[in-house]
């Protein structure tokens, strides 16, 4: 099933850039595509040529992946064969991966090399992938009893290890009697890390985070439950795309 040289160019030549850019495609991903083409021989890529397309993983389920854009499947579902789950955890697709899909069968053919990946060791000691190809990570905490410098250090360690830009986001400043106490604690402990204090329900929240949310940038939100991550997602999206706590 080796591809002819004319087919090698098809994935690159037929990119629907506007559709991909809507899901975070940027020049760094373009470089990863070039690296994929250079690293994979025709036999390695199987049929990933003339009848294939690129998409991004937005969810991982037991039955397969949900990807976007996926013109041939309205629900974005991509079946995944067993071979993808027989190898190491890091070889399996995760949220944020750019994948090559057979445009005719809708099957997963290959993945582009990752430029970053957030991962952790779960309570059972197994490696767990969180997200791939992330540009900036918003590490969210709040002005209340959840505030923990030690927890923030753990998140920072994960993000910096992945070579991702960290941003410390302090939420619920409108509910704190004296938010400056929390702001000062962050500044003293993490002087070299970008920090933003916001009321996630205010109109200014999106503007404060805009430098890390430009077109083509992919951000991840990390933080414990209840710190306002869903509220921030809604603020950045300009719509209620995530349900928030009462």
Predicted regions and their residues:
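Switch I (effector-binding) loop of TRAFAC-class P-loop GTPase G-domains
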Residues: 239-246
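Conserved catalytic network of the ASCE P-loop NTPase/AAA+ motor domain
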Residues: 129-132, 160-162, 214
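Short coil/loop residues immediately preceding or within conserved phosphate-binding loops
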Residues: 52, 216, 239
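N-terminal accessory targeting/assembly segments
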Residues: 1-149
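Histidine-anchored nucleotide/phosphate-binding helix
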Residues: 150-160
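Conserved beta-strand/loop subsegment of P-loop NTPase cores
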Residues: 134-141, 161-173, 191-198
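Walker A/P-loop
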Residues: 230, 235
């Amino acid at each position: 099933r080796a591809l002819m040289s004319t087919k090698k160019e098809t994935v690159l030549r037929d990119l629907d850039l506007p559709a991909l850019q809507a899901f975070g495609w940027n020049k760094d991903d373009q470089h990863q595509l070039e690296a994929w083409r250079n690293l994979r021989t025709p036999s390695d890529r199987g049929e990933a040529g003339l009848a294939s397309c690129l998409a991004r993983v937005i969810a991982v389920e037991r039955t397969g992946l949900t990807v976007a854009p996926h013109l041939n499947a309205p629900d974005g579902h991509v079946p995944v064969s067993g071979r993808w789950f027989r190898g190491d955890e890091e070889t399996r697709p995760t949220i944020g991966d750019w994948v090559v899909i057979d445009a005719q069968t809708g099957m997963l053919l290959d993945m582009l090399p990752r430029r970053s990946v957030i991962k952790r060791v779960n309570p059972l000691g197994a490696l767990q992938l969180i997200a791939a190809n992330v540009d900036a990570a918003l590490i969210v905490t709040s002005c209340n009893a959840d505030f923990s410098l030690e927890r923030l250090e753990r998140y920072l360690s994960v993000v910096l290890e992945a070579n991702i830009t960290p941003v410390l986001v302090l939420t619920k400043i409108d509910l704190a009697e004296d938010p400056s106490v929390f702001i000062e604690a962050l500044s003293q402990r993490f002087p070299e890390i970008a920090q933003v204090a916001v009321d996630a329900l205010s109109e200014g929240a999106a503007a404060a985070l805009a430098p890390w949310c430009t077109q083509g940038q992919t951000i991840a939100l990390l933080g414990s439950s209840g710190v306002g991550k869903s509220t921030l997602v809604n603020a950045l999206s300009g719509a209620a795309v995530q349900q928030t706590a009462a």
